[in-house]
């Protein structure tokens, strides 16, 4: 019984730092364009944000291909200010949404590098979100 945790930890440690992915990883090969990126971003943020109502100053950039963690990914950058639990607002923050195989994979809270030099346009749909 005492050996079970040791055996399981050995299995977990034997991947040599490889990340777990459930998609077909093309590495540095080109990815398909995320055609429904706006809809996917809105659906994700509706569940991700503590309060999706009352978002301000929302802007979004068109998807661009970037190398993230040694892998080619489409990145959609956005900047917005979400309503806090006390009803106030912080300064708008930039976030990056990563797409794999044309589908939303994850969000990067620290988006300074992947979002450098992008042109933003208003994202009114995000400001109109409801619960």
Q: What is each model feature region?
A:
Residues 12-131:
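Cystatin/cathelin-like cysteine-protease inhibitor module
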Residues 7-10:
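C-terminal motif of bacterial Sec signal peptides marking the signal peptidase cleavage site
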Residues 1-4:
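Sec-dependent signal peptide recognition
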């Amino acid at each position: 019984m005492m050996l079970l945790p040791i055996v399981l930890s050995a299995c977990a440690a034997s991947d040599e730092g490889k990340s777990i992915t459930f998609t077909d990883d093309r590495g540095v090969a080109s990815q398909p364009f995320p055609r429904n990126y706006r809809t996917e971003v809105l659906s994700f943020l509706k569940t991700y944000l503590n309060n999706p109502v009352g978002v301000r100053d929302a802007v979004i950039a068109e998807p661009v291909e970037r190398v993230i963690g040694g892998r080619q990914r489409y990145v959609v950058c956005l900047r917005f200010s979400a309503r806090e639990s006390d009803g106030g607002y912080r300064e708008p923050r930039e976030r990056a949404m990563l797409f794999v195989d044309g589908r939303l994979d994850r969000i990067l809270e620290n988006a300074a590098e992947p979002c450098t030099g992008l042109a933003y346009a208003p994202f009114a749909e995000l400001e109109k979100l409801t619960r």
